[in-house]
């Protein structure tokens, strides 16, 4: 109530006190249950502690007994005692580390057997006499005189070990029992908590359904109250038309001028920024389009040249075609994905915009309903003040009637005293005169209060009485006065009946007014509760829709991030593949250059061989002439083949180098084209990102402008109701004497004015506003 400014003074109500008492009772029951659990756990821990102390005590006693026996033992029984010590050591270790009785017994027996066998193996083969002496108990008893005492000590030792084992098993059983009980209690508590959780969920579902039904009923009641309030507003508008119209027109003009000026400034700045950004983007887009067109022309020319080269060579590179096809396929795939993501984002933005519009309409409807309920509360406050004035008037009337009843009671008491003493003093004329004077005064008072015209002067005129006394003194007898008293009694009875009727009517009227006041108070409390519940539901819905909008935005950002990551991944894959292909082309070119170098070397060798062989060939005719003119046919055939090979090599040499140069030029052009293609793709992606950013910013600006326009329309539609509600709240704020009421009324003003944080800070800095501002809002 205090949060929404509905409690205009006073302490906590009876309902709040009962709720606090119930919560304290629940807390006491919880604390009692926790205390019982703590006591139970403490008792179980005490049992475990006692069991562990008993086991520790037994172990310490066994250790002391072992020490005592080892100190008193004779030298002839060294080996059995060592065996027993080992067995006891093994049993103590096993019982100290085991988790149950069976494992402890098994470990003890196994370790004892292993100890005896190890001792026997370590002792080795004994001589026959020693084996016979130590083989049986009779031999030991006949050979040594201390045999019976050692046997009794061994029996005591065995009995002591058995008792220790029994105590250890009992302590272990108690510990396991406590652990199992704790585990069972833990499982029971877990089951109970699950059941409580299910019950709480069921209760929450039922409460949610009930609240939805209550919300529907409240909406219907709000519609009814809205219709009633409209009629009341029409009635009140006729009464306060002049002042309200003047104030409304002035405030409307001022607000419209301010809003128009602010809107024009904001729109001017936004349009300037938008025009500058669009002009810059348009210039960039035109420049990029020109660059892309130029590059596409160059690419087409280069493609034509490549096609001519391929046609000349008639050996197209299949890997380059596959690369281009794959690049085109990836480009189309990415464009399709981009268009699909853009459609998804546009659809999500449309859904968010529609949902935000619906939520704003609902919030506006709820705010109008809240303003109407606040106006209804103002009317109820006025009716309450009127009822209080009527109650005050009725209280004054009741006090007046109480005074009349008191006077009537005094008159009745005086009349009874007159009746009692009438017989005794009826014969005295002076006494009767005094009584008549008193009765006359009482009659005058009663006549004034009951507004009955009685001619008291004529009845009790002293001149008439004096004349009657002088004329006929004998007629002043008891009968005359008794008749007058009878008349007075009748008049008194009539007045008494009238007073009773008045009292009855007053009581019935007070009862009806009290019932009406109680009904009005109950209705006011119900309306306050409904207002609070509606406000809370409105806030919950608003927070829920804000959360949904944030989730949508996060999902959109996530999808965009995934798309960008996939795009970058595909670009990286494409770059890796292009780099690999470029490396292969470079390797192929290196191999071609190496082959060309080898061919050059071979040609040089052939030329050198041809030159060396050509010199004797030229000299052969001289020798032939000197030698008789005969030559070798094999030498002539070899020289002819060499000259033909040289001629072929010389003829094919320019074409081979031209082919190598063309291959190198083609590789250089391909690498440059790939670089240009990569650069163009990067620029295209950057342009797409910029266009997307520009589109998002434009959509945000359009949404902000639409929300601002809708807010202005809502403000204009709700201006009359808000001004009326604000007038009532400010009137209440100015008429309240206490600071607590002022703070609560100020919180009610906040529900309609919606101060910004900067305005709140300015108000808090002021010395006068800081005292009015509530501590919870700072």
Swiss-Prot record:
Say if the entry is tagged with keyword Glycosyltransferase. Answer: no
Subcellular compartments: Cytoplasm; Golgi apparatus membrane
The UniProt regions of compositional bias labelled Basic and acidic residues, in chain numbering, are: 83-93
Question: Could you name the Gene Ontology cellular component terms for this entry?
Answer: Golgi membrane
Q: Which Pfam families match?
A: GRIP (PF01465)
Give the way it sits in the membrane: Peripheral membrane protein
According to the UniProt entry, the coiled-coil residues are 13-61, 152-702
- The GRIP domain covers 716-766
Quoted from the entry, the domain comment is:
Extended rod-like protein with coiled-coil domains.
Summary of the function given for this chain in its UniProt record: Probably involved in maintaining Golgi structure.
Q: What is this protein called?
A: GRIP and coiled-coil domain-containing protein 1
- Organism listed in the record: Mus musculus (Mouse)
């Amino acid at each position: 109530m205090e949060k929404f400014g509905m409690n205009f003074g006073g302490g906590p109500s009876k309902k709040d006190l009962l709720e606090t008492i119930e919560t304290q009772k629940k807390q006491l029951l919880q604390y009692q249950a926790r205390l019982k659990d703590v006591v139970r756990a403490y008792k179980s821990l005490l049992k475990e502690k006692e069991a562990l102390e008993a086991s520790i005590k037994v172990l310490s006693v066994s250790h002391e007994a072992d020490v005592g026996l080892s100190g008193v033992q004779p030298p002839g029984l060294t080996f059995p005692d060592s065996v027993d010590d080992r067995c006891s050591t093994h049993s103590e270790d096993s019982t100290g580390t085991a988790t149950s009785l069976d494992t402890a017994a098994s470990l003890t027996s196994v370790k004892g057997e292993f100890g005896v066998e190890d001792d026997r193996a370590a002792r080795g083969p004994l001589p026959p006499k020693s084996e016979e002496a130590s083989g049986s108990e009779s031999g030991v008893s006949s050979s040594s005189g201390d045999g019976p005492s050692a046997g009794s000590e061994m029996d005591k030792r065995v009995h002591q070990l058995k008792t220790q084992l029994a105590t250890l098993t009992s302590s272990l059983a108690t510990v396991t029992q406590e652990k199992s009980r704790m585990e069972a209690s833990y499982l029971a508590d877990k089951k109970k908590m699950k059941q409580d959780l299910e019950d709480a969920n069921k209760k929450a579902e039922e409460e949610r359904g009930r609240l939805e039904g209550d919300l529907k009923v409240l909406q219907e009641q709000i519609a009814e109250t809205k219709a009633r309030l409209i009629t009341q507003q029409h009635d009140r508008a006729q009464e306060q038309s002049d002042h309200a119209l003047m104030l409304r027109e002035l405030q409307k003009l001022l607000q419209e001028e301010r809003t128009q000026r602010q809107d024009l400034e904001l729109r001017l700045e936004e349009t300037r920024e938008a025009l500058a950004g669009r002009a810059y983007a348009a210039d960039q887009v035109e420049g990029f389009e020109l660059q892309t067109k130029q590059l596409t022309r160059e690419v087409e020319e280069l493609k034509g040249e490549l096609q001519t080269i391929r046609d000349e060579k008639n050996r197209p590179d299949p890997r380059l075609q596959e690369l281009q096809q794959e690049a085109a396929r990836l480009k189309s795939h990415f464009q399709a994905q981009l268009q699909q993501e853009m459609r998804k984002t546009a659809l999500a933005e449309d859904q968010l915009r529609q949902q935000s519009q619906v939520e704003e309409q609902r919030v506006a409807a709820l705010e109008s309903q809240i303003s109407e309920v606040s106006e209804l509360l103002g009317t109820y406050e006025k009716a309450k003040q009127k009822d209080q004035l009527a109650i005050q008037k009725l209280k004054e009337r009741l006090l007046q009637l109480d005074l009349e009843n008191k006077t009537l009671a005094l008159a009745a008491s005086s009349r009874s005293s007159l009746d009692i003493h009438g017989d005794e003093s009826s014969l005295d004329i002076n006494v009767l005169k005094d009584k008549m004077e008193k009765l006359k005064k009482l009659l005058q008072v009663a006549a004034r209060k009951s507004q009955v015209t009685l001619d008291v002067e004529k009845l009790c005129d002293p001149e008439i009485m004096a004349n009657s006394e002088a004329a006929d003194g004998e007629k002043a007898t008891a009968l005359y006065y008794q008749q007058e008293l009878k008349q007075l009694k009748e008049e008194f009875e009539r007045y008494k009946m009238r007073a009773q009727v008045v009292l009855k009517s007053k009581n019935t009227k007070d009862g009806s007014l009290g019932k009406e006041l109680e009904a009005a108070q109950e209705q006011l409390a119900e309306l306050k509760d409904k207002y609070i519940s509606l406000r809370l539901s409105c806030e919950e819905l608003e927070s829920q829709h804000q959360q949904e909008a944030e989730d949508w935005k996060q999902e959109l950002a996530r999808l965009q991030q995934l798309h960008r990551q996939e795009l970058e991944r595909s670009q990286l894959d494409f770059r890796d593949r292009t780099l690999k292909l470029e490396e292969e082309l470079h390797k192929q070119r290196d191999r071609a250059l190496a082959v060309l170098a080898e061919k050059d070397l071979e040609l040089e060798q052939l030329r050198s061989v041809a030159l060396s062989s050509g010199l004797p060939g030229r000299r052969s005719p001289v020798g032939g002439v000197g030698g008789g003119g005969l030559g070798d046919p094999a030498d002539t055939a070899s020289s002819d083949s060499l000259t033909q090979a040289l001629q072929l090599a010389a003829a094919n040499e320019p074409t081979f180098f031209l082919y190598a140069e063309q291959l190198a030029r083609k590789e250089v052009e391909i690498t440059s084209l790939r670089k240009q293609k990569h650069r163009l793709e990067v620029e295209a992606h950057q342009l797409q990102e910029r266009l997307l950013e520009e589109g998002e910013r434009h959509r945000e600006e359009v949404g902000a402008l639409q929300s601002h326009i809708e807010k202005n329309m809502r403000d204009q539609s709700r201006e009359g109701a808000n001004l009326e509600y604000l007038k009532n709240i400010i009137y209440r704020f100015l008429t309240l004497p206490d600071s607590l009421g002022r703070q609560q009324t100020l919180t009610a003003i906040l529900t309609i004015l919606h101060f910004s944080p900067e305005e709140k800070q300015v108000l808090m800095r002021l010395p006068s506003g800081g005292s009015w501002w509530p501590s919870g809002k700072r």
